[in-house]
């Protein structure tokens, strides 16, 4: 008879098999009422799951981290049930859980409208309020195919037909609706209290553009209404901060169909870009990097040697001329090895730190393109360090110091670190992997960094550290990477002469901090809602005249600011000062310097911030000092 070990270490002995619900009720009726699911020996299951033998058990309530997956999966079924109730001719396909929510794809003769979504949501609340029991049963594969064909659900029958014949399938029923699903699900629809349908979009059947178009309804679901409201607020804020909208409103960049996924930088946007590049270049010099430049078009022979042609070919832009095949580089690593290989290297030359603002192209699917966040042409702050195995720890420690310093200057202090460890299929001996993984851990410990291990998620050629930023809405953006590579140097015949005179292969460390300039700019724009820190703002101050009598003085103020390194402009238009202030505030210019007759007479400016704060009057020297000091401080405000 089963012994059940609970999270607190307590072991409960039972005389007969029993369900997770029964165990919860044995502990307390309140726990049984709150139980959503269970985790038996690490596997997530329904509360109706029958425990027949000894196991460890976690009872999942809405407070447990597993609860949202179960709630969202069940809400996807609730959505499908509501759609079938309102639109019986609609056919169901799949409805998985995604980040922060779920979706369900339907085949229907017409497009769902916003009014339809409202009706569907009302019906979902009605079904949830009915507190319908959710039950599970199993069917053999062939019976399941015939069952769904009998319901007119051809798509579901096709899905089942792809499953091996000897498999038994699970179906979940709630009321008069039944769907194919592995589960688990909540015990009844009454557990689904906080959800919202967010949008409808097109989606190809099985993700293939040659197949018919389906309709995908997206939604979100949470354990309670407070969490739902907080999420919807974040969603609303994210919509306001959308870098594509702000990019247009602030005249930073645009995209066109003539160059999908490639940015047309406007003067203001290019100013930000150049500031990023200038900043990174200076930081890299401080840390001993040598900047290089490698070709855009490279013969396929290099990509074949590096392994990219076999594994990355579909994502490369290729061309042919004079009977030779070339690829536009999707990454800079193989080219950096060519520079390393140019000339004999000794152990005394290591570590060798090479950096490039690598202009790369990748043939991303058109449907995946998303403003600056997903592009086909990107510039990466790419660097590769060639070193010995014994130098890995010290080099990684130096990289982490640089990463933390750079992110701080951009105003990001909450950094999450993840250590991707060896996968089953890998190159290199266990001893080498032990050494590399230990070096990465010790480097992080030396910087007082806390991290999460990700077993099995390293690349086949080495472990890596992933550095992710948390923005003002709590969204996580993976930007930085520190990757150990045991493979590419050997594939491309990189070597050095060791102290004992032997020929050795160096370790290659791939390193990016921003990731791509384009994506990082998108993150910055959304994080700051367009109100970039002073040092990054394309226009840092604008001088506003009250009348044309101050034009000459305004020009003098602007020139003085520019000589002190401030990006300044002026507005001499014959418009009311209130109109000018509003217009430049909407353009999110950090400082508005108003000049009238009194300011001209006293050689001063009246200073306002873009947030409407009146800083009073200042002399020209004072405002210059104020702005230049803030620019120097960067994110340390």
Swiss-Prot record:
Q: Which SMART domains match?
A: tRNA_SAD
**Sorted UniProt keywords:** Aminoacyl-tRNA synthetase, ATP-binding, Cytoplasm, Ligase, Metal-binding, Nucleotide-binding, Protein biosynthesis, RNA-binding, tRNA-binding, Zinc
Identify the domain of life: Bacteria
Q: How is the cofactor bound?
A: Binds 1 zinc ion per subunit.
Q: How does it assemble?
A: Homodimer.
Compartments reported by the entry: Cytoplasm
**Binding-site list for Zn(2+):** 333, 384, 510
Region listing for Catalytic, in residue ranges:
242-533
Residues in TGS domain copies: 1-61
> Belongs to which family?
Belongs to the class-II aminoacyl-tRNA synthetase family.
Q: Name one Pfam family in it.
A: tRNA-synt_2b
Q: What is its main location?
A: cytoplasm
Some GO term, biological process aspect, for this entry: which one? threonyl-tRNA aminoacylation
- Which GO terms fall under molecular function for this chain's record? ATP binding; metal ion binding; threonine-tRNA ligase activity; tRNA binding
Role noted for this protein: Catalyzes the attachment of threonine to tRNA(Thr) in a two-step reaction: L-threonine is first activated by ATP to form Thr-AMP and then transferred to the acceptor end of tRNA(Thr). Also edits incorrectly charged L-seryl-tRNA(Thr).
The record, for Gene3D superfamilies, names: 3.10.20.30, 3.30.54.20, Anticodon-binding domain, Bira Bifunctional Protein, Domain 2, Threonyl-trna Synthetase, Chain A, domain 2
Q: Name one GO cellular component term.
A: cytoplasm
Q: Cross-referenced InterPro entries, in alphabetical order?
A: aa-tRNA-synt_IIb, aa-tRNA-synth_II, aa-tRNA-synth_II/BPL/LPL, Anticodon-bd, Anticodon-bd_dom_sf, Beta-grasp_dom_sf, TGS, TGS-like
Cleaved signal peptide residues: none
Q: What is this protein called?
A: Threonine--tRNA ligase
Q: Which organism is it from?
A: Legionella pneumophila (strain Lens)
């Amino acid at each position: 008879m089963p012994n059940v070990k609970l999270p607190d270490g307590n072991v409960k002995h039972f005389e007969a098999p029993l369900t997770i619900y029964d165990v919860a009720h044995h502990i307390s009726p309140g726990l049984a009422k709150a139980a959503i699911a269970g985790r038996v020996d690490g596997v997530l299951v329904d509360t109706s799951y029958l425990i027949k033998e000894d196991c460890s058990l976690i009872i999942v309530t809405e407070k447990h981290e597993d609860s949202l997956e179960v709630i969202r999966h069940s809400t996807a079924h609730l959505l499908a049930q509501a759609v079938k109730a309102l639109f019986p001719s609609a056919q169901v396909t799949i409805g998985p859980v995604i980040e922060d929510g779920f979706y369900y794809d339907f085949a229907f003769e017409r497009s769902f409208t916003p009014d339809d979504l409202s009706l569907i949501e009302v019906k979902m609340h009605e079904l949830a309020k009915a507190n319908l029991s959710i039950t599970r049963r199993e069917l053999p594969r062939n019976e399941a195919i015939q069952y769904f064909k009998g319901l007119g659900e051809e798509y579901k029958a096709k899905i089942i037909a792809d499953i091996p014949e000897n498999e038994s399938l699970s179906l979940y029923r709630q009321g008069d609706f039944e769907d194919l699903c592995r589960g688990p699900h909540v015990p009844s629809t009454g557990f689904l209290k906080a959800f919202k349908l967010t949008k409808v979009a097109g989606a190809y059947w099985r993700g293939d553009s040659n197949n018919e178009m389906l309709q995908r309804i997206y939604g979100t679901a949470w354990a309670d209404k407070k969490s739902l409201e907080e999420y919807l607020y974040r969603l609303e804020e994210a919509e306001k901060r959308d870098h594509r909208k702000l990019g247009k409103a602030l005249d930073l960049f645009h995209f066109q169909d003539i160059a999908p996924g490639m940015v047309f930088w406007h003067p203001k946007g290019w100013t930000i870009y150049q500031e990023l590049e200038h900043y990174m270049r200076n930081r890299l010099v401080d840390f001993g990097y040598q900047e290089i430049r490698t070709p855009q078009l490279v013969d396929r022979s290099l990509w074949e040697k590096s392994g990219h042609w076999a594994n990355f070919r579909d994502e490369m832009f290729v061309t042919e001329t004079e009977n030779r095949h070339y690829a536009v580089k999707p990454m800079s690593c193989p080219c950096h090895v060519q520079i390393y290989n140019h000339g004999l290297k000794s152990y005394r030359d290591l570590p060798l730190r090479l950096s490039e603002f690598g202009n790369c192209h990748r043939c991303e699917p058109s449907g995946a393109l998303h403003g600056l966040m997903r592009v086909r042409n990107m510039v990466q702050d790419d660097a590769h360090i060639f070193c010995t195995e014994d130098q890995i720890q010290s080099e990684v420690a130096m990289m982490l110091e640089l990463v933390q310093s750079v992110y701080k200057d951009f105003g990001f202090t909450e950094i999450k670190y993840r250590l991707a460890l060896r996968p089953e299929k890998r190159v290199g001996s266990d001893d080498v992997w032990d050494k590399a993984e230990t070096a990465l851990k010790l480097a992080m410990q030396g910087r007082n960094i806390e991290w999460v291990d990700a077993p099995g998620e390293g690349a086949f050629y080495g472990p890596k550290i992933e550095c992710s930023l948390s923005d003002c809405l709590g969204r996580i953006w993976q930007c930085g990477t520190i990757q150990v590579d045991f493979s590419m140097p050997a594939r491309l015949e990189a070597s050095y002469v060791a102290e004992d005179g032997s020929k050795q292969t160096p370790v290659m460390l791939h390193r990016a901090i921003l990731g791509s300039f384009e994506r990082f700019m998108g993150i910055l724009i959304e994080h700051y809602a367009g109100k970039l820190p002073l040092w990054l703002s394309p226009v840092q101050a604008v001088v506003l005249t009250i009348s044309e009598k101050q034009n000459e003085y305004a020009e003098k103020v602007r020139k003085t600011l520019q000589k002190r390194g401030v990006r300044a402009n002026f507005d001499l238009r014959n418009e009311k000062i209130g109109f000018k202030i509003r217009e430049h505030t909407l353009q999110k210019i950090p400082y508005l310097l108003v000049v009238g007759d009194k300011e001209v007479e006293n050689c001063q400016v009246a200073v306002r911030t873009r947030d409407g704060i009146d800083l009073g009057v200042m002399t020209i020297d004072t405002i210059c000092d104020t702005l230049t000091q803030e620019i120097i401080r960067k994110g340390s405000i």
